[in-house]
Curated annotation (Swiss-Prot):
EC number: 4.1.1.6
Entry comment describing in which tissues the protein is expressed: Expressed in LPS-tolerized macrophages (at protein level). Expressed in peripheral blood mononuclear cells (PBMCs), microglia and macrophage cells.
Region (Disordered): 462-481
Organism name: Homo sapiens
Protein's UniProt name: Cis-aconitate decarboxylase
Location in the cell: Mitochondrion
Annotated phenotype, changing H277Y: Strongly reduced cis-aconitate decarboxylase activity; reduced protein stability
Subunit architecture: Homodimer.
Effect of H159Q: Strongly reduced cis-aconitate decarboxylase activity; reduced protein stability
GO biological process: cellular response to interferon-beta; cellular response to interleukin-1; cellular response to lipopolysaccharide; cellular response to molecule of bacterial origin; cellular response to progesterone stimulus; cellular response to tumor necrosis factor; cellular response to type II interferon; defense response
Induction conditions: Up-regulated after lipopolysaccharide (LPS) stimulation. Up-regulated in LPS-tolerized macrophage by LPS. Up-regulated in peripheral blood mononuclear cells (PBMC) of patient after acute sepsis.
Result when mutating T97M: Strongly reduced cis-aconitate decarboxylase activity
Record note on what altering T97A does: Strongly reduced cis-aconitate decarboxylase activity
Length: 481
């Protein structure tokens, strides 16, 4: 018997995996990912980058349309609904993170909500249909990342969601559309030609477009494959194919369907407690511990008493921003997150408003920060740590270290805290009743007979009293909501 190519084995898995292959752990973990992603998306609709992306997308029209989450007055063609919802999800860097490093959910979920609403089907798409396609999209991303040692570390060249996310999106769309194994293979080949975005756009308004484009291009790849477009049949096997994105690419054939095991069963995701790059969560935890030695819990930090702040972190240049000037730079700044936590005792959504970033006390603390890169502190979300030392002018030094923050896969958020995060995020755009209904539906998603129940709730409406995009600025972070 002729051995399958790597590309063919992926197509076989995408086409052949069934609801019965889903394990209870995979179902439970993916429902948490879906809830968290929806919340990040609703909150993201308050951002400037979402507004720009949605205004751009309104120039397109179609006979079929899908919901833009939390925006009852905006309907777009499915590809553009997926695009703007993907942009919203990543607009504050508040979405989930996996290992090897990527944001897995943001490129996949918008595809499925857009298709579930726009495409006629009898019987209707069920919650199990959505869960299966979602997990196929997540699985494809994880398998591809495991083919390159480079992917274990934080990226230096390509932003992973723009690479593996595009193929995960295409896989999820292909599964949802019921494409044949041959068409699934073509969709992957087409998606590879849409993949890739440079890390140079990290900490800018353009970075969220990486997730939106991955979602959009994945749908396009599946539709084009369905219509007969063909690509290289070994695109995942070749150095000049998907291997172009990784210097040490070494792909392997996927397990057979009969003995298939999901990567999500083995490796959970991390959920963020505040909207910033995942690596800054270690810094925040270490800074919070040091702060307890300096002042009482709710007391103001006397910044003039501090002589020196040393951060011992992995050497990740795109999160090394000594004096951030925008919210996106602050979200990618070890220095800013450490200083904000020392000063305020907490990091929240308003921590990244420019009026908070530019406070004189923050700039004073930033000027006292030094970075050290211990050789054992590697730039991998699975093994990195952060140590912070604060030296006072009287010579006293206080040091603490974080090896695992709350929300990391080794110390996962409780279901209660995950739901509270969703409530805080989604309530910016939705009524309380709608928020609670969404929590209930996602919790029981495998029992949902018709996904239109879910997509109807995603529309809104947006209560006027919570629809403001720009809360008034105040130098006291506790006065911001």
């Amino acid at each position: 018997m002729m051995l399958k190519s790597i590309t063919e084995s992926f197509a076989t898995a995408i086409h052949g995996l069934k609801v019965g292959h889903l394990t209870d752990r995979v179902i439970q973990r993916s429902k948490r990912m879906i809830l968290d992603t929806l919340g990040a998306g609703f909150l993201g609709t308050t951002t400037e980058v979402f507004h720009i992306a949605s205004q751009y997308s309104k120039i397109y029209s179609s006979n079929i349309s899908s919901t833009v989450w939390g925006q009852p007055d905006i309907r777009l063609p499915p590809t553009y609904a997926a695009f703007v919802n993907g942009v919203a999800i990543h607009s504050m860097d508040f979405d989930d993170t996996w290992h090897p490093a990527t944001h897995p959910s943001g490129a996949v979920l918008p595809v499925l909500t857009a298709l579930a609403e726009a495409l006629p089907r009898s019987p209707k798409f069920s919650g199990l249909d959505l869960l299966l396609a979602f997990n196929v999209g997540i699985e494809v991303q994880g398998r591809l990342l495991h083919f390159a040692k480079e992917a274990n570390d934080m990226p230096k060249r390509f932003h992973p969601p723009s690479v593996v996310g595009t193929l995960g999106s295409a896989a999820a769309a292909s599964k949802f559309l019921g494409l044949s194994s041959t068409k699934c293979r073509e969709a992957l080949a087409i998606a590879v030609s849409h993949a890739g975005a440079p890390m140079a756009n990290a900490a800018t308004q353009t970075k969220p477009l990486h997730i939106g484009n991955a979602a959009k291009h994945g749908i396009e790849a599946a539709f084009l494959a369905m219509l007969g477009l063909q690509g290289n049949k070994q695109v995942l096997d070749l150095e000049a194919g998907f291997g172009a994105f990784y210097a040490n690419y070494s792909p392997k054939v996927l397990p057979s369907i009969a003995s298939y095991s999901w990567l999500l069963d083995q490796q959970d995701v991390a959920f963020k407690r505040f909207p910033a790059h995942l690596s800054t969560h270690w810094v925040a935890d270490a800074a919070a511990s040091v702060r307890k030695h300096l002042v009482a819990e709710r007391a103001l930090l006397p910044t003039d008493y501090i002589k020196r702040i040393v951060l011992r972190i992995p050497n990740v240049q795109y999160v090394n921003r000594p004096f951030p000037v925008s919210e996106h730079e602050a979200r990618h700044s070890f220095q800013y997150v450490a200083c904000a936590m020392l000063l305020d005792g907490g990091i929240t959504v308003p921590s990244f408003h420019e009026c908070q970033i530019n406070r004189p006390q923050v700039r004073e603390l930033l000027s006292k920060v030094e970075l050290e890169y211990p050789p054992d502190n590697l730039p991998s979300f699975n093994i990195l740590y952060c140590e912070i030392s604060v030296t006072l002018k009287d010579g006293a030094t206080f040091t603490d270290r974080s090896d695992t923050f709350y929300g990391h896969w080794r110390k996962p958020l409780s279901q209660e805290d995950l739901e509270e995060k969703f409530r805080a995020n989604a309530s910016k755009m939705l009524s309380w009743d709608t928020v609670e209904s969404l929590i209930k539906i996602v919790k029981n998603l495998e029992d949902l007979e018709d996904c239109s129940v879910l997509t109807t709730l995603l529309k809104g409406p947006s209560p006027p009293e919570v629809a403001s995009n720009s809360p008034a600025c105040n130098n006291s972070i506790t006065n911001l909501s």
